[in-house]
Design a protein with these regions (language model features):
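C-terminal cap/loop subdomain of S1 sulfatases and analogous C-terminal strand-loop tails that border
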Residues: 3-9, 30, 35, 44-113, ...
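Active-site-proximal N-terminal segment of extracellular/periplasmic enzymes that hydrolyze or transfer
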Residues: 120-128
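Extended hydrophobic/aromatic segments used for targeting, binding, or gating
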Residues: 12-22, 27
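A small-molecule sensor/coupling module
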Residues: 138
Length: 156
């Protein structure tokens, strides 16, 4: 599936943000012999390669960044990731509870359990400073992890 589409939410139109309406992508996997289920675990599109490889009985290379999410097909409660990253006009770090939208020096922070429509920006509220610092550190670690791969793009 493609990304979502804004229809005026957050004063935005079309696909121009990293808010939930635009960044969340439905994923449907149909595997012969597996019962239908709905999973709510976080995943990234980069997880499709190792997942399809595993389902086809192929060896998954150890140096890829995606994670095999096929375990969710047997147990919908399986959690593969504690956070997922999206990027566009900024970066989104999404955990089950939090959404950090990072635009460099500015940003947005939302409690997705209590504010799933992302209306109450907590980014500059002092009582969320520890949560914000923890999520920023997690985002930085994720970006470092992404940068450490065997792809030498300078040779392309």
């Amino acid at each position: 599936s493609d990304h979502g589409y804004h229809l005026g939410e957050h004063d935005l139109w079309q696909k121009v943000s990293i808010h939930e309406e635009s960044a969340k992508v439905p994923l449907i996997i149909c595997v012969p012999g597996k019962k239908p289920a709905v999973c709510h675990s976080l995943a990234e599109l980069i997880d499709l390669y190792p997942t399809v490889s595993k389902l086809c009985g192929l060896k998954i290379p150890g140096n890829i960044q995606g994670k095999d999410i096929s375990g969710m097909l047997d147990d919908p409660a399986v959690k593969v990731r504690d956070a997922a990253l999206s990027s566009g006009k900024g970066r989104l770090l999404r955990t089950e509870k939090w959404a950090l939208l990072d635009y460099g020096k500015k940003g947005e922070l939302y409690d997705m359990e209590n504010d799933p429509k992302q209306y109450d920006n907590l980014f500059e509220k002092s009582e969320y400073a520890d949560t914000l610092a923890r999520l920023k550190a997690k985002l930085k670690a994720k970006l470092v992890e992404i940068g450490k791969n065997d792809l030498n793009l300078n040779k392309l």
